[in-house]
């Protein structure tokens, strides 16, 4: 049996977009399939049925300052894998992947990077859907042909995730509700909130929804809690504007999004939760 290791530090949206690659690798090759991943985003792959093992490292290990720790972590895996697929784009990760041994496949943006790989995907069109770029790794590997139509995202939602959300809905006596997540650009590797809506615009959106009589659930991670509280303080709708940031885990949040009548978000991991739930026109991003 082939043994394949994936390396991807994060973030949540990127890992969700990588799930078609993970699924196809397992289904087409029946291989041992493991992934080295950053802790903060690893929640996107919890209970993924196609992965044998998540090797979770501290997010700081993937920075330049953390290079010695990443090197030790990868070297500990040396000789255990036949192929290493690097899902991060920078040549640095291709170089580090050689510590594992095996045949390294990844992305290139320079001639130097080509020398580090036995098979390479040229990363040239940043507007192309990343899920397709991830499938390119399988295609160029020669191990199997990638199916570019099989791009549904995998996110495992357990019964306990569903029950937690349904209990909240019952407790608050909610019928129809809208979910809003204003996030993006605040994670283990960036902190400036570059993909968030500016305060004036998010307040205008929320005020418009509330004036229509809608109940709005402000979801998100713990890092979004303070921003959401600020919105509550500026909008006087205590019964219909509810801050849920940090209340539910990723899978439960995805289920909540699927239960909503409409979902508003930004270019962040939450957008991919909506895609995973296949809510289509009920999402505005």
Predicted feature locations:
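Catalytic machinery of carbohydrate-active enzymes
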Residues: 1-285
């Amino acid at each position: 049996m082939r043994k394949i290791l994936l390396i991807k530090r994060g973030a949540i949206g990127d890992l969700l977009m990588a799930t078609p690659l993970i699924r196809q690798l397992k289904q087409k090759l029946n291989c041992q399939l493991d992934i080295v991943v950053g802790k903060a985003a690893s929640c996107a792959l919890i209970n993924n049925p196609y992965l044998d093992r998540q090797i979770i490292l501290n997010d700081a290990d993937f920075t330049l300052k953390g290079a010695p720790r990443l090197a030790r972590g990868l070297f500990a895996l040396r000789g255990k894998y036949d192929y290493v697929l690097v899902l991060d784009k920078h040549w640095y990760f291709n170089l580090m992947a050689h510590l594992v041994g095996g045949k390294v496949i990844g992305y290139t943006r320079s001639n130097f990077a080509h020398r580090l790989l036995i098979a390479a995907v040229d990363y040239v069109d940043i507007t192309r859907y990343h899920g397709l770029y991830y499938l390119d790794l399988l295609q160029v590997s020669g191990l199997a042909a990638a199916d570019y139509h099989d791009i549904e995202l995998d996110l495992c939602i357990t019964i306990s995730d569903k029950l937690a959300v349904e209990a909240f809905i019952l407790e608050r006596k909610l019928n129809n509700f809208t979910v809003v997540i204003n996030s993006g650009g605040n994670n283990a590797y960036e902190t400036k909130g570059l993909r968030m809506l500016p305060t004036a615009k998010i307040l205008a959106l929320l005020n418009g929804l509330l004036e229509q009589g809608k109940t709005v659930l402000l979801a998100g991670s713990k890092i979004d809690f303070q921003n959401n509280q600020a919105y509550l303080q500026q909008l006087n709708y205590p019964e219909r504007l509810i801050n849920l940031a940090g209340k539910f885990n990723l899978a439960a949040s995805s289920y909540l999004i699927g239960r909503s009548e409409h979902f508003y978000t930004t270019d962040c991991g939450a957008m991919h939760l909506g895609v995973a739930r296949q809510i289509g026109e009920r999402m505005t991003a």
